[in-house]
């Protein structure tokens, strides 16, 4: 429903199910790093669960859950036991629909420290400079250095604005793999996400990266 594409592959006789939800925001990132901060805050509490309650519930059901920002999309994924698929989707639904983003300052400071520590590695510095130069002036060139240079421009308001685009101006795709029938997947997904705004595949406003000869 809502034009959300759902792909399901059944792997019989396997004990766990994996789900990946990819959401491509149709607008260019307002500030380098703002989508990364938003993704980190998805696991820091919702209107229904505090961060501690969320962590405890994921641990109690042995659900591996993560959210991260890629160059082209936001990825939320989990791996759960077969019998806990509906519970894992319910938690995903809560995170997607009801995240509060209350720990913004704390998470921003934490991310800044992690990026600085990451750049202590010579290997990381090489990759950082390589991609920064290769995709200069393009979102693919959003490196740790570029995020650190712009980190003071990342605000709570911009995170909320990005979240609005995440919900209302984005293409949404869900993939599920495990020992589960496609009809059951469809029923659970529809029940959880039928109220989400429609998935829209607007042409990207990001320019195509160009490799220039020296």
Question: Predicted regions: what is each one?
Answer:
Residues 9, 14-40, 51-98, 113, ...:
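M16 family metallopeptidases and their MPP-like homologs
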Residues 45-48, 97-103:
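Short, polar/flexible loop-turn hinges at active-site or ligand-entry regions and domain interfaces
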Residues 56, 99-116, 181, 200-212:
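Acidic/histidine-enriched alpha-helical segments
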Residues 136-145, 149-150, 168-214:
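An aromatic/glycine/proline-enriched structural segment found at the starts
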Residues 151-155:
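Short, charged, amphipathic alpha-helices and their helix-cap/turn boundaries
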């Amino acid at each position: 429903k809502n034009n959300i594409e759902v792909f399901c592959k059944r792997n019989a006789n396997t004990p766990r199910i994996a789900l990946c939800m990819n959401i491509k925001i149709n607008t260019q990132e307002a500030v380098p790093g703002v989508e990364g901060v938003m993704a980190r805050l998805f696991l820091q509490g919702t209107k229904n669960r505090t961060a501690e309650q969320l962590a405890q519930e994921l641990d109690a059901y042995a659900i591996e859950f993560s959210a991260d920002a890629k160059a082209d999309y936001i990825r939320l994924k989990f791996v759960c036991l077969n019998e806990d698929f509906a519970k894992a989707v319910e938690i995903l639904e809560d995170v997607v629909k009801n995240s509060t983003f209350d720990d913004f300052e704390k998470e921003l400071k934490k991310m800044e420290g992690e990026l600085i520590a990451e750049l202590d590695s010579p290997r990381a510095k090489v990759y950082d400079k390589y991609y920064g130069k290769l995709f200069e002036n393009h979102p693919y060139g959003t490196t740790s250095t570029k995020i650190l240079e712009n980190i003071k421009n990342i605000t709570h308001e911009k995170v909320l604005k990005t979240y609005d685009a995440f919900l209302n101006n984005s293409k949404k795709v869900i993939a599920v793999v495990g020992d589960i029938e496609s009809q059951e997947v469809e029923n659970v997904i529809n029940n959880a996400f039928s109220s989400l705004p429609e998935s829209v595949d607007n042409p990207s406003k990001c320019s195509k990266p160009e490799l220039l000869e020296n």
